[in-house]
Regions:
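C-terminal, non-catalytic "cap/extension" segments appended to globular domains
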Residues: 12, 16-25, 30-46, 51, ...
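Secondary-structure transition/capping motifs at alpha-helix termini
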Residues: 91-100, 151, 155-161, 181-192, ...
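Short pre-active-site segment immediately N-terminal to the catalytic Zn-binding motif
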Residues: 127-144, 159
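Post-HExxH zinc-binding segment in Zn-dependent metallohydrolases
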Residues: 157, 162-204
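Short glycine/serine- and small hydrophobic-enriched flexible loop segments
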Residues: 174-181, 185, 216-219, 278-285
Length: 325
């Protein structure tokens, strides 16, 4: 695959071109996008792109906090992390707090719910089992609760319908923010620590939002029967640079080369974090964020709700000018 996909001399600068005028990489990119458009598992996602596009643009407009120090103010061991998470959950829902502690120390047939790894891994939760590397820092403490919220909400029925879990990262991103604020209020971490956590999460969410907007634009081109060409892709990137915190041109090109080389789009996974970031920001401004968290949490562990219903809820509750209730 040509690594210099966008460093080119091309004749494809005409608006109306035929398939015969495309080079091999352009043909491949069009093929990748067409396969996603036609795939049954992707059609409900693509049908909701208008809503997802608006959410992406809102996430990109969120302001990153000011960081005064780039180091954490303290170390936090895993036992303290578990203790603080339990104390915090008690302020939201005692049943949830009890479930957290039961699962943390659950060890049935050597199958632990919380699995601490000794080497670096990207934290994840699989079939109700949480896997993290604990580094005794504040970020690890937040990550531990994030993955345990996934584990606590797991069910076999939900796993079976995992493709429809577009809100699956919403309770975890909400809980990250609420837990971080509680830690500041109880003088366990500093305001700068909170800002570091918020900046880390928002930066990742905005990166995913930029990439998802690019994927949506590629799908839109093909749905309009336009061939994806290098010129059109570069124009698309340049047109979106006015959006706050949109990725740089170089980052966009690097990402689209990844799509081309891997023959894969990533919007299905990315939109979970983007929606979570969007809802977390809205709930942060509400009168009772703890109640809002519980509503979202119980909604996401319901295996019978589909993506379309989730997005209707988002439109009704969180795309209003004012959710101060």
């Amino acid at each position: 695959m040509n690594k210099d996909f966008f460093n080119f001399e091309s004749n494809n600068f005409k608006e109306n071109i035929s398939k015969e005028q495309l080079d091999s990489d352009e043909i491949e990119m069009n093929k990748i996008i067409d396969e996603y458009i036609q795939h049954p598992d992707c059609q409900s996602y693509i049908a909701n792109f208008k809503t997802i596009k608006q959410i992406c643009e809102e996430v990109l407009k969120q302001r990153r906090p000011e960081i005064k120090e780039i180091e954490w103010s303290r170390n936090i061991g895993i036992n303290d992390a578990i203790k603080y998470a339990h104390q915090f959950l008690t302020t939201i829902d005692s049943t949830l707090a009890d479930q957290f502690m039961n699962l943390v120390y659950q060890n049935n047939n050597n199958q632990k719910t919380l699995n601490i790894q000794q080497k670096y891994i990207k934290p994840y939760c699989e079939k109700g089992k949480a896997y993290i590397e604990y580094r005794s820092d504040i970020k690890s403490m937040i990550t531990l609760l994030h993955e345990m919220i996934h584990a606590m909400g797991y069910s076999d029925a939900m796993h079976t319908n995992s493709e429809d879990r577009c809100l699956s990262e919403s309770p975890t991103l909400i809980i990250e923010n609420l837990f971080s604020k509680w830690l500041v209020e109880n003088k366990i971490i500093t305001q700068n620590d909170y800002n570091l956590l918020k900046e880390w999460r928002l930066r990742d969410s905005q990166d995913l939002a930029s990439k998802t907007l690019m994927e949506i634009a590629l799908v839109d081109m093909r749905k309009k029967d336009q061939y994806i060409t290098k010129k059109r892709v570069l124009e698309m990137i340049d047109e979106k640079q006015h959006i706050n915190n949109f990725a740089t041109r170089e980052e966009c090109i690097y990402y689209l080369m990844k799509v081309l080389n891997n023959k894969e789009l990533y919007f299905k996974e990315s939109e979970r974090y983007i929606i979570g970031q969007y809802i977390s920001d809205k709930i942060d401004k509400s009168r009772n964020p703890e109640k809002e968290f519980l509503e979202i949490y119980h909604l996401t562990i319901n295996p019978n709700i589909k993506s379309e219903e989730y997005l209707k809820i988002i439109k009704g509750k969180y795309q209003e000018p004012n959710i101060d209730r």
